[in-house]
Each structure stands twice: as structure tokens, then as C-alpha cells.
């Protein structure tokens, strides 16, 4: 197995695979520290300046490790970028055979049952919603993942989205007639089988809050968890675990 020096040196694996790659001492040192933390199941906080190349510095050690790792990003856009661009790049450079998976929250996946429910529903009289529903139905016949993010023409706040996605409250689970074809179920199965799972902070802490209730969790257990943009964690975590008191309650 390659060492960190084999990966990040001037004649290393990244330099050989990525045009214009320039070794940076801070990047190599960070990668070594991340590798050490993973190998010893330790904790590590890294503050890296702009241009350090921190993404490669944590992806390479994760790919070189034997256990399952979760990588969490600050936003869904960064999650997409990491999974579709950075991770394949480093994986190819290392010649890694590790399995990877992208996992998003439930509302990001098409619900086949709800699409069927609302198809032909005469109560959907507004042209905008009907047009969006037709667009979703056309896309549903070709998508492999059911990830609503694939539908670039659909606005993020499209009014049809609550009609074609599910929530914890309205999901039928194993009682759903489309359970075996459910895109959310498929995404979780892929995550269970993967070595590297890419999530985002909101999903991570929402899932942790669900774990506290004893059901409904999506993210599998892992040997290592890596948070990118970790400075966002206090605000996001407090949304799910914080308590607030008013002055009236205190008195």
C-alpha cells in the first residue's frame, strides 16, 4: 500500500495523475496527521489556510485506510463536488478499489409511491405544478438514482417537490408497494456496502437526532468520520440538539 509520501511527493501518485499538481508541505503534513488519527482511532482538528489542498489531504488517507469512513461537507453543493470530482480524481490516482457512495436526506429522493398517488390527480389544477409533475414523471423513467438534484431544470423551491418526495411522517416504509424499488432504500443499501460515504452536515446531525429516537436512521456506522468546513458544526448541531429558553421561562 502506498505511503503518504508516495502519494504527495513531486514524483508521487497525485503528481503522476493530475496535471499541474505541486507538492505542498502543509498538505503532506496534514495528510500524515489525518492518516495517523484514522489508524489510531484518534481525534484531530486541523485549521488549514487557503491553498493548502485540504480536500486531497483527507481523501487520500481515507482511501488508504481499511475501515469505513464518512466524509461530511458543509453544503450539498460541496457534497456533489466532492463526490463527483475530487473523490474520483484521488481514487484514480491511488488506483484504489474502495467503494464509494453519495447519501442525501430523504427529501432529496424521488418517492415512486407519491408520484403514482398524484398522477392524474384533478386537485392539482395549477399549470405550474402540473407542468413540474409532468417533468418529474418523464425524468423518473430514466433516472438510476432518483436524486432530485439531477433535475437541473426544476427550481430548488419547486412547489411539486413535497408531492413527489417523502418525509419520515408519510413514508410507509416496508409497507410501501414500491419498497423494493425505493430510491432512498437503494441509496442506503449502497452506503451500507460502501467504504467511503459522502454526506453533508445537515444530514449527519438530523440522522443523529433520529438515532436518539431509536428508528429511521440512514447513515451506517463507520470507523472514521471526517468533517470538512467543521466551523459550521456548532450552528448546525444546535439546530437539532439545542434548547432555547425565553426570559419568561427563566422567571
For each predicted feature, which ranges?
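Walker A/P-loop NTP-binding motif
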Residues: 35-36, 55-68, 85-89
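Residues immediately C-terminal
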Residues: 78, 204, 232-235
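A substrate-engagement module of RecA-like helicase motors
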Residues: 2-17, 67-197, 202
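Conserved pre-motif I regulatory segment
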Residues: 2-46
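The conserved Walker
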Residues: 50
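Conserved phosphoryl-transfer catalytic core
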Residues: 230-231, 235-251
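Short basic/glycine-enriched coil/helix segment immediately N-terminal to the Walker B
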Residues: 185-195, 211-223
Amino acid at each position: 500500500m502506498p505511503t503518504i509520501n508516495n502519494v504527495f511527493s513531486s514524483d508521487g501518485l497525485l503528481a503522476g495523475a493530475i496535471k499541474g499538481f505541486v507538492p505542498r508541505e502543509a498538505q503532506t503534513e496534514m495528510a500524515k496527521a489525518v492518516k495517523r488519527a484514522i489508524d489510531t482511532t484518534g481525534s484531530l482538528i486541523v485549521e488549514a489556510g487557503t491553498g493548502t489542498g485540504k480536500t486531497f489531504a483527507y481523501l487520500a488517507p481515507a482511501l488508504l485506510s481499511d475501515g469505513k469512513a464518512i466524509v461530511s461537507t458543509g453544503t450539498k453543493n460541496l457534497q456533489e463536488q466532492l463526490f463527483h470530482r475530487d473523490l474520483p480524481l484521488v481514487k484514480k490516482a491511488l488506483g484504489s478499489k474502495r467503494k464509494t457512495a453519495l447519501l442525501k436526506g430523504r427529501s432529496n429522493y424521488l418517492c415512486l409511491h407519491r408520484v403514482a398517488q398524484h398522477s392524474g390527480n384533478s386537485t392539482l389544477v395549477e399549470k405550474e405544478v402540473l407542468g413540474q409533475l409532468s417533468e418529474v414523471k418523464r425524468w423518473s423513467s430514466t433516472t438510476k438514482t432518483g436524486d432530485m438534484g439531477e433535475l437541473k431544470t426544476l427550481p430548488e423551491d419547486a412547489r411539486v417537490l413535497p408531492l413527489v418526495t417523502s418525509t419520515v411522517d408519510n413514508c410507509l416504509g416496508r409497507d410501501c408497494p414500491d419498497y423494493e424499488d425505493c430510491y432512498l432504500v437503494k441509496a442506503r443499501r449502497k452506503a451500507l456496502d460502501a467504504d467511503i460515504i459522502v454526506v453533508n452536515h445537515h444530514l449527519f446531525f438530523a440522522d443523529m437526532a433520529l438515532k436518539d429516537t431509536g428508528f429511521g436512521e440512514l447513515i451506517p456506522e463507520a470507523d472514521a468520520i471526517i468533517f470538512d468546513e467543521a466551523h459550521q458544526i456548532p450552528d448546525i448541531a444546535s439546530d437539532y440538539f439545542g434548547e432555547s429558553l425565553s426570559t419568561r421561562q427563566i422567571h
